[in-house]
Amino acid sequence: MTLFASSVLLAASLLSVPSQARTLFKYERIQLTQEYLDTLPQEDAQLFAFEDKFVAAPNKTATRCRYFPDDGKWPSDKAWTKLGKQLSSVDALIKPVPQAAVCYPGPIQDDVKCKQLTANWTNSYTHISDPTEILSPVYQGLTCQPPTIYNSGNCTLGGYPSYVINAKTVLDIQLGINFARNDGVRLVIKNTGHDFAGKSAGAGSLSLWTHNLKDITFFDKYVDDSGYTGPAIKAGAGVQAFELYKAASDHGVVVVAGEGQTVGVMGGYIQGGGHSPLSSLYGMAADNVLGFEIVTATGEFTTANSTNNQDLFWALRGGGGGTFGVVTSVTVKAYPEMPVTAASWSFDSTKIGKDRFWAGVRAYVDHFIDNVSNSTYSYFTISPNGNDVTFRMQPFFAPNKTLNTASNLLQPHWTTLTRLNIPINPKLTQYKSFYDAWQAEFPLEPQSDVQTAFGSRLFPRSNFESETGRNISFGALKDSVNAGQIIIAFNMAPALARGGNPDNAVNPAWRNSILHAITGRRWDVKSSANDILAARKSFTNGTMQKWRDVTPGSGSYLNEADRLEPNWQQSFWGNKYAKLLGIKRNYDPKDVFWAVNAVGSEGWTVESFDGLPNENGRLCMVNETISTTTSRMRAMEEPTPVMVV
Ligand SMILES: Cc1cc2nc3c(=O)[nH]c(=O)nc-3n(C[C@H](O)[C@H](O)[C@H](O)COP(=O)(O)OP(=O)(O)OC[C@H]3O[C@@H](n4cnc5c(N)ncnc54)[C@H](O)[C@@H]3O)c2cc1C
Ligand SMILES: *[C@@H]1O[C@H](CO)[C@@H](O)[C@H](O)[C@H]1NC(C)=O
Ligand SMILES: *[C@@H]1O[C@H](CO)[C@@H](O)[C@H](O)[C@H]1NC(C)=O
Ligand SMILES: *[C@@H]1O[C@H](CO)[C@@H](O)[C@H](O)[C@H]1NC(C)=O
Ligand SMILES: *[C@@H]1O[C@H](CO)[C@@H](O)[C@H](O)[C@H]1NC(C)=O
Ligand SMILES: *[C@@H]1O[C@H](CO)[C@@H](O)[C@H](O)[C@H]1NC(C)=O
Ligand SMILES: *[C@@H]1O[C@H](CO)[C@@H](O)[C@H](O)[C@H]1NC(C)=O
Ligand SMILES: *[C@@H]1O[C@H](CO)[C@@H](O)[C@H](O)[C@H]1NC(C)=O
Ligand SMILES: *[C@@H]1O[C@H](CO)[C@@H](O)[C@H](O)[C@H]1NC(C)=O
Ligand SMILES: *[C@@H]1O[C@H](CO)[C@@H](O)[C@H](O)[C@H]1NC(C)=O
Ligand SMILES: CC(=O)N[C@H]1CO[C@H](CO)[C@@H](O)[C@@H]1O
């Protein structure tokens, strides 16, 4: 009897592999504790208190706007100094100065430095390594740009934050969140600043800068309760694509991340969904997440994975950055390295004329479905230049395909182009690994300019199934180019062929889409605010409406979208929005985290100084919602008087 029982036990323990214990980076083990707060003078403890332990002074967060420097309610210099002293390193609290201050009258004006900065301005590294700069300066409000690029007259902070915490530990993040929440200060998170809509900036804010959280750990065999057993990588919130791909390659694996070299993988990218050169094979980056470590709005540091905070885990995989908390690290699945073949080619209308040019483009569009069914990803642009138009494939990316197979995929197209008498000089290369292919094929992308608005649309597979559908979709794209707009597009299918897609917050429109197309409208750099608004209106409600009209019920990718996207809740999340909003209300009822067009952001708006859509102003409640929101906040504040003053 006894023998029998123990052998059953043994068999059971062999079958059920124990799941992974919580593995924290060193910087995640340095945390703020209640025990520590209890040792501080009460006045200081109040500044940094956790939400469930202490409630801010009455009415503080119930004012119409977040406090702003010089409004009389902004925390005193003394309070900021106290914050600085509690952080894990002495220089972690930064009072930012825009880089281009060297170009304007003032104490640090320096013509030589200004020239160097101007020469380097469009290089994205110039901005990523800075605590406040963002890659879409239009949404910072265009103050303090190098004058030969955009003369802003003087150098003010504009949409940049008032203070930045260069976060090096979980402690720093907890202190920042608690301080901002308790003192009515707007909070923003900047990782790399790649966000298309300026979500990583904000005037009069305290910014948590996650860029330096760079740790990476590899697991040979990660065991997750969701059923996954296999290689995995845990990476810090500040890890960028070039660093993650290198680390993966060092261990002979690949991970699903973006094409851009400098994008911050574990910040806005993965939380917003994340498309990848591997998406037609492995889905969206968010589909591959096993767990997040996160500091929530209360200041608590916790895990969101398949067994812990499951609702938060669901929301963080596609629900968008800057909304539910500050993620400190993410664990993702990894897959074996594979060979990749990539191709690039281009042609333009100069010698062949527009009709042949468009016939060549059309021959490619006609095969979108066939190509992605072979797990390929292609990245192409169609750019007008005066009377001419250029098509550039850069690159066509065929993961796990040999030169021969990839050549078979493309040869029919090249034959068609030859038949159309369109000269091309294609380059086809087989790489031994994804890492080599990615490094060689994707150039460093520049910072975006000071006079363009971008928008995007997901085009469903069904649009390309019939000739009528292809005519209509192709017509809409062609019309935009003929109207002078560039198209930057991706042919991919991030629907998992094998095993189905995990249930998460990724925009359902991605699942049946095979084209993600981005376009932009430029305006004259000297345009008045009114002219810019008019140009934007005709872009958002004119051109982009034509794309919406041919893709009814679909949506747009929130990470590469128009800041003025109408009906963004449906567009970015479709039928998942209601559930996301419920999770937001539950984890962040006081809107400690706010970003434009983020889940639950409806009640607030940035009142910019120039009336343009940007971060250059106070964050205030939308007037109609004040009374209800305020009473909701008061109701929440009342029942928790823990400390007696
Ligand atoms: C050149 C370029 C190439 C790109 N390539 C791709 C691509 O291949 N695939 C793709 O899907 N997208 C791509 N994007 C879009 C990209 O996904 C978004 O710009 C994304 O927001 C970048 O995230 P980030 O953290 O680097 O940027 P940031 O601008 O720093 O942050 C973006 C948002 O996430 C929030 N956030 C950042 N870190 C955290 C955190 N730790 N916790 C919580 N919230 C956080 C910020 O507050 C902000 O709201 C590209 C963008 C650019 C400019
Ligand atoms: C708090 O708000 C209530 C209602 O608006 C007001 O009557 C009260 O005077 C405020 N208290 C403080 C300290 O501002
Ligand atoms: C760009 O910046 C680098 C330092 O990051 C500097 O060495 C270089 O001179 C700058 N380039 C130009 C053209 O000034
Ligand atoms: C900066 O210039 C703008 C526009 O000319 C002006 O409105 C603003 O008052 C100036 N700010 C400062 C601090 O001089
Ligand atoms: C999920 O998170 C909890 C809490 O950190 C942890 O105990 C558990 O092991 C995690 N599960 C997996 C599979 O990692
Ligand atoms: C890659 O190709 C090999 C050989 O054709 C195949 O066995 C393997 O399943 C492929 N991997 C993926 C992820 O498709
Ligand atoms: C891929 O697209 C090209 C260009 O349209 C086409 O010629 C080719 O047939 C497609 N591949 C497959 C497998 O259909
Ligand atoms: C598609 O467009 C072509 C060229 O304009 C036209 O000849 C063809 O009849 C159209 N097909 C359908 C089904 O509308
Ligand atoms: C587009 O039209 C809608 C509805 O008329 C309007 O609310 C919105 O402000 C317009 N968008 C822009 C950018 O003008
Ligand atoms: C909201 O109301 C306040 C006064 O209560 C006013 O100053 C502000 O301009 C209004 N904001 C908008 C966007 O109408
Ligand atoms: C290798 C491979 O998957 N080839 C497929 C490419 O797509 C065409 C059309 O869908 C299929 O017929 C091939 O089998």
Where are these regions (language model features)?
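Fungal secretory targeting signals
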Residues: M1-T23, V645
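Soluble FAD-dependent oxygen oxidases
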Residues: R22-V645
